Amino acid sequence: MGVHLDENMSWEHHINHVINKISSSNYALNQLKKFVPTNIRKTVYNSLVKPHIEYAIISWGNSKCEGMKRLITKQKQAIRNVANAKFNAHVDPLLGTLKILNVEDTLKCCTAEFVKSIFLDKLPNSFKQIFKPMNSERVVKLTV
């Protein structure tokens, strides 16, 4: 794991790295769907795909680079493999059935958890110097 940022301050390299990891996992999921039940494939997804999507997503998840579309496509492929669905099956119902968040919802959830940890004063000390709650309950002061 790690975050890859290129000389142009673009997240494209990092997102391509995540796509490559998910592609490798998709191969494993595709092979497993012939032999193991859905709950085991979901565990494999949670072990091999989900950590790469979640890692530092607050930093790179709002990137508008071309790689984000490919990443979303790769996640959909992984979901179809977990659910043993056809290659053109609509993914939204599968996400609900499997109780898995798509990339966009993962970003929202991780961001909400981060903001919650700011207000509950549960950040590491290195972050506490940057994010300081103000008197207002609705404002977070960012000091740089």
Task: Tell where the protein language model's regions lie, with residue ranges.
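Hydrophobic/basic alpha-helical segments
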Residues: 1-144
